[in-house]
């Protein structure tokens, strides 16, 4: 099922496979995605006036803020970029300016669209590559003009075509003309001058042209290179750019992480000048403006912005009022409980238990996680979070890594065995580190 036609309920069900809890946040992003489809059904000129409702997610680290946005973008197959607000500085200061967010998003969309187009023309490209390789293996007769005349395949050519498709010619060496890729010119510019760097790269790329050069290689390697070359010939670059820019403008998603770090705190001093400057620079992007990229002008009016932050030392009200108004939907994410940790370990589609079982399974070591072992792991992770820094579900990575440290190191010695992970095994491996606050701080 295409994500563009999924109902909010179906989107939430899909997110439930990877993220435990946080139903309010899931519902908010599901409605935002569905509203994109609804907007496309509205007639112009009203359609142009309907803007996405940007979302502000508030919650401690490790509760699923980033994962929700990442899974949503994957589900929607939309251009998506995650950036940290702290990476940017006010225009005029040393550092990256906020326009690079849209440039990076456009680059991603170009790559995504190119891959889609490559898949579309792949069959034609493979047929052309097959003919070129057969020309090298069984040269066709030449006509009066000197051009190859393939006509009907000769018996020898048909035989080689059959062998080629069966993979029996893969190790034969042939000499074939391959386009030499133009070396990428890397332009070094001071921070804040990314636009100039893009223009210079485009200028140098326009001066260079691909040159063909005869090269000896095996058929298998040659086939792969020729398919890429033939596919590139069949793609119209202008149409590709137009489609990629339209995809960014209509479906792009920007995830602004750590937005609380650029919120001005009332008790702090001079550093707030730059923080407020970044907020002011973000305003036109979020509200809707035009950004110049190497592929053309990109409008940001219908790009969805999802901001997130823990807001431990500041509050959403510490953001400048204009920026607060650009994020009308606010969702608070709850801290995770020990029971949530149990579900994260066992219920999600790509749970840590499945990941580690698959990794050690490659060495013929079978892991058998018992329910009491999973519960004990969750309790230990939750306990360490309460006594030290609360890093949410990320604590499970540390706990699992420590639990299986010895086993991972000596996996070959346990080849062919089944290791039972129950509460006793977990206590034997982790109880000392978990019970000592000093050890827990540094080890877990």
Curated annotation (Swiss-Prot):
Binding, ATP: 20, 62-67, 257, 322, 394
The entry's keywords: ATP-binding, Chaperone, Cytoplasm, Nucleotide-binding
This protein's encoding gene: hslU
Origin organism lineage: Bacteria, Pseudomonadati, Pseudomonadota, Betaproteobacteria, Burkholderiales
Subunit structure comment from the entry: A double ring-shaped homohexamer of HslV is capped on each side by a ring-shaped HslU homohexamer. The assembly of the HslU/HslV complex is dependent on binding of ATP.
One Pfam family hit: AAA
Any one GO CC term of the record: HslUV protease complex
UniProt entry tagged with the keyword ATP-binding: yes
GO biological process: protein unfolding; proteolysis involved in protein catabolic process
Family: Belongs to the ClpX chaperone family. HslU subfamily.
Designated name of the protein: ATP-dependent protease ATPase subunit HslU
Superkingdom of source: Bacteria
Record localization: Cytoplasm
GO molecular function: ATP binding; ATP hydrolysis activity; peptidase activity; proteasome-activating activity
């Amino acid at each position: 099922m295409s994500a563009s036609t999924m109902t909010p309920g179906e989107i939430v069900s899909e997110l439930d496979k990877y993220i435990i809890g946080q139903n309010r946040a899931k519902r908010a992003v599901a409605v935002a995605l569905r509203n994109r489809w609804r907007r496309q059904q509205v007639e112009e000129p009203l359609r142009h006036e309907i803007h996405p409702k940007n979302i502000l997610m508030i919650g401690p680290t490790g509760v699923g803020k980033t994962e929700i946005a990442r899974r949503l973008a994957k589900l929607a197959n939309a251009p998506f970029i995650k950036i940290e607000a702290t990476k940017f500085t006010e225009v005029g200061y040393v550092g990256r300016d906020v326009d690079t967010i849209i440039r990076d998003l456009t680059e991603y969309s170009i790559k995504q669209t190119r891959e889609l187009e490559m898949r579309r023309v792949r069959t034609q490209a493979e047929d052309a590559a097959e003919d070129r390789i057969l020309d090298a293996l069984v040269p066709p007769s030449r006509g009066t003009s000197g051009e190859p005349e393939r006509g009907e395949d000769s018996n020898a050519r048909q035989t080689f075509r059959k062998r080629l498709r069966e993979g029996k010619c893969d190790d034969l060496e042939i000499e074939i003309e391959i386009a030499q890729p133009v070396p990428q010119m890397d332009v070094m510019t001071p921070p804040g001058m990314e636009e100039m760097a893009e223009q210079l790269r485009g200028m140098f790329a326009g001066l260079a042209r691909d040159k063909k050069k005869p090269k000896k290689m095996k058929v298998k390697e040659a086939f792969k290179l020729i398919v890429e070359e033939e596919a590139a010939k069949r793609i119209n670059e202008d149409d590709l750019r137009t489609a990629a820019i339209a995809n960014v403008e209509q479906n792009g998603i920007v995830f602004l992480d750590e937005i609380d770090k650029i919120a001005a705190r009332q008790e702090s001093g001079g550093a707030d000048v730059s923080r407020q400057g970044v907020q002011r620079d973000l305003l036109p992007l979020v509200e809707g403006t035009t950004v110049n990229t190497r592929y053309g002008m990109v409008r940001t009016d219908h790009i969805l912005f999802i901001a997130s932050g823990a807001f431990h030392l500041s509050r959403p009200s510490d953001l400048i009022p204009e920026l607060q108004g650009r994020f009308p939907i606010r969702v608070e994410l709850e801290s995770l409980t020990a029971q949530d940790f149990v579900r994260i370990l066992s219920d999600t589609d790509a749970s840590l238990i499945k990941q580690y079982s698959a990794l050690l399974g490659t060495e013929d070591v079978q892991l058998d996680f018992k329910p009491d072992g999973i519960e004990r792991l969750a309790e230990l992770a939750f306990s360490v979070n309460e006594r030290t820094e609360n890093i949410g579900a990320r604590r499970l990575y540390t706990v699992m890594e420590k639990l299986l440290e010895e086993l991972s190191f000596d996996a070959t010695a346990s080849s062919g065995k089944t290791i039972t992970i129950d509460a006793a095994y977990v206590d034997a491996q982790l109880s000392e580190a978990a019970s000592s606050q000093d050890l827990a701080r540094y080890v877990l």
